[in-house]
């Protein structure tokens, strides 16, 4: 039989999370962000849930082609725009919307021979300092785009750096909103400002809600402002479960160590379980398993923690308080466990010093992945 590890993808959880985004976004239209193969979940696996969105947003043309091949006829937005001039031909053929965030992209459009005008989102850098025109340069970019016969409607967008929580001494999104509104107040076109954190925390304000919101990490059941708020606070459901089983147990005596580097040393007699999961499966090698500083897991739905260093194919967990656990017991690394138990990916990520996004996207190809709705149909 194969190794007992598997990932389960829950499309109905994603559909539920998109409904929560809509509840916060009011009358704004909803982009479901599916970059990085739907944050590691697999576009095709979550496809039924995506039908509840108004548009699909991603990064590359391959993913755009995939959703068109799946039958999506609604708006598709390339969040980083075109990477070279020849991308415009496929944008035209697939009827893709694309972001314009630098001068070269305007030049490519000006030289492009198209059968139909392009729908673009002109991006302003309001403080994130990754992509976009400065407030001072935005109007000139808009004028140049508006003069091109290759361009149809021009929408406007920006991206928040601190929507999850304000930096000390800063004012969250207020300064970025003010810059965007001042620079665009007399320009026509739809607007898109809100990412996941802004949808949940700030969309009661009409200028933040605007015309389109972009639901990213919240769609997949991770809280964008964890640890301030967990998924229960936002009524989100994990759309991915990573689970395995115990394949061995060991009885330790005081002074015995566990794993490479002997990072964990038993202070008293204890029992541990060995789980068929390691960093080659996408579990973080740096997840701590030290005394007083360990990473949570569920065994048969009951919470315990890792011990020792994560290996390529295995990790160890503390069974001291779980006398019924043994070989074959189910281990939930994150997501939904048995008997209604739950281990949010954010809790694992926080212990490992990372974020849920990274764990989702790091799921290894060798892990068998199946689609399983949470609710019976």
Swiss-Prot record:
Pathway annotation: Amino-acid biosynthesis; D-alanine biosynthesis; D-alanine from L-alanine: step 1/1
Keyword Isomerase: yes
Originating gene: alr
Listed Pfam families: Ala_racemase_C, Ala_racemase_N
Species this chain originates from: Leptothrix cholodnii (strain ATCC 51168 / LMG 8142 / SP-6) (Leptothrix discophora (strain SP-6))
Catalytic residue positions: 35, 260
Molecular function GO labels: alanine racemase activity; pyridoxal phosphate binding
Protein name as it appears in the record: Alanine racemase
Single GO BP term: D-alanine biosynthetic process
Family membership noted in the UniProt record: Belongs to the alanine racemase family.
EC top class, as a word: isomerase
Statement: the UniProt record of this protein carries the keyword Cell inner membrane: no
EC number: 5.1.1.1
Binding site for substrate: 130, 312
Domain of life: Bacteria
Gene Ontology CC: cytosol
Catalytic activity: L-alanine = D-alanine
Keywords for the protein's UniProt record, in alphabetical order: Isomerase, Pyridoxal phosphate
Cofactors (names): pyridoxal 5'-phosphate
Residue pairs linked by disulfide bridges in the UniProt entry: none
PROSITE patterns (UniProt xref): ALANINE_RACEMASE
Xref: Gene3D superfamilies: Alanine racemase, Lyase, Ornithine Decarboxylase, Chain A, domain 1
Job of this protein: Catalyzes the interconversion of L-alanine and D-alanine. May also act on other amino acids.
